[in-house]
From Swiss-Prot:
An MF annotation (GO) of this entry: unfolded protein binding
Name of protein: Protein GrpE
GO CC term, one of those recorded: cytoplasm
Subunit record text: Homodimer.
Function: Participates actively in the response to hyperosmotic and heat shock by preventing the aggregation of stress-denatured proteins, in association with DnaK and GrpE. It is the nucleotide exchange factor for DnaK and may function as a thermosensor. Unfolded proteins bind initially to DnaJ; upon interaction with the DnaJ-bound protein, DnaK hydrolyzes its bound ATP, resulting in the formation of a stable complex. GrpE releases ADP from DnaK; ATP binding to DnaK triggers the release of the substrate protein, thus completing the reaction cycle.
Alphabetically ordered keywords of this record: Chaperone, Cytoplasm, Stress response
Entry's Gene Ontology BP terms: protein folding
Primary location recorded for the protein, binned into one broad class: cytoplasm
A Pfam family matched in the record: GrpE
Region (Disordered): 229-248
Taxonomic lineage: Bacteria, Bacillati, Cyanobacteriota, Cyanophyceae, Nostocales
Compartment(s): Cytoplasm
Length: 248
C-alpha cells in the first residue's frame, strides 16, 4: 500500500510539471514568436551567399578556366579536322581504285566478248568452208548436165532441190555470193588465175568468175577465182621484123 501511494504521488508530480510547461509556452507573446521567425529568415538569407561562394570556389578548384577550355576545344577541332582530311584522302584513293578496277573489268569484259565472237565466227567460217565444195559441185552439175528424158529431169530436180535447201541454209547463216563480173580486179576479194588479152575491156577488168567467192557477213569467206582482162599485144613490130630479111 505504501508503494502504490508513492507511485501515485510521482505520477501527479509529472502531470503537474507538464501542465506548467504548457502554460509557459502559451504565455509567450506573439511578438516574441515573430522575432524568432525574423531571426531565422535573416540567418537563412545570410547563409545562401555563403553557399554560392563555396560552390563557385569548388567549381574553380575542380574544373578548368575559360582559356583552358578554349585551348582544349581548339586542339580537339584541329584533331577532328585532321581526321576528316585523312578520311577524305582515303576516300579519294578508294574511289580512284574503284574506278580503275571498274575500267579494267569493263575492258576485260569487252575483250572476252570480242574473243568469244571471233571464236564463234571462226568455227562458223571453218564449217561453211567445208560445205562450199559441195555447193560448187551442185553448180557444175547444173551447168554441164542437160537432162534429155523425163527420168533424167526427175533426178535433176531432186538434186537441185537439195542444192536449193543448202543455199538457203547458208544464206540464213549470213553467207552471200560475190558478183565480180565487169568489176575492177581487187586483190582483197579476187584471185586472178587467168589473163586474157583484149581491147574490149580496160586492163584489170574481171571478165569471168571461174570459182565463185563468198562473203560471211561483211567479211570475205572465200576469194573469187577470176579471169582478168590484159592489154592486147601489138603485132606490128613482129610483122616488120619478119619483112626486113625478105627485103634484103
Amino acid at each position: 500500500m505504501i508503494d502504490e501511494n508513492k507511485q501515485v504521488n510521482h505520477t501527479s508530480q509529472q502531470l503537474g510539471e507538464s501542465t506548467e510547461v504548457k502554460q509557459a509556452i502559451m504565455s509567450e507573446s506573439p511578438a516574441q514568436i515573430n522575432n524568432n521567425e525574423s531571426t531565422n529568415e535573416v540567418t537563412e538569407s545570410v547563409a545562401i551567399p555563403t553557399n554560392v561562394v563555396g560552390d563557385t570556389t569548388a567549381t574553380e578548384d575542380n574544373g578548368f578556366t575559360a582559356t583552358q577550355i578554349q585551348e582544349a576545344n581548339t586542339a580537339a577541332l584541329a584533331e577532328l579536322t585532321q581526321q576528316i582530311n585523312s578520311l577524305k584522302t582515303q576516300l579519294d584513293e578508294r574511289s580512284t581504285q574503284y574506278m580503275r578496277i571498274a575500267a579494267d573489268f569493263e575492258n576485260y569484259r569487252k575483250r572476252t566478248q570480242k574473243e568469244k565472237e571471233e571464236l564463234d565466227l571462226q568455227v562458223k567460217r571453218n564449217t561453211i568452208l567445208e560445205l562450199l565444195p559441195i555447193v560448187d559441185n551442185f553448180e557444175r552439175a547444173r551447168s554441164h548436165l542437160k537432162p534429155q528424158t523425163e527420168s533424167e529431169m526427175t533426178i535433176h530436180k531432186s538434186y537441185q532441190g537439195v542444192y536449193k535447201q543448202l543455199v538457203d541454209s547458208l544464206k540464213r547463216l549470213g553467207v552471200s555470193p560475190m558478183r565480180p563480173e565487169g568489176q575492177e580486179f581487187d586483190p582483197n576479194l579476187h584471185e586472178a588465175v587467168m589473163r586474157e588479152p583484149t581491147d574490149e575491156h580496160p586492163e584489170g577488168t574481171v571478165l569471168e568468175e571461174l570459182v565463185r567467192g563468198y562473203y560471211l557477213g561483211d567479211r570475205v569467206l572465200r576469194h573469187s577465182m577470176v579471169k582478168v582482162a590484159a592489154p592486147k599485144e601489138d603485132t606490128l613490130p613482129a610483122q616488120e621484123n619478119q619483112s626486113s630479111p625478105a627485103d634484103s
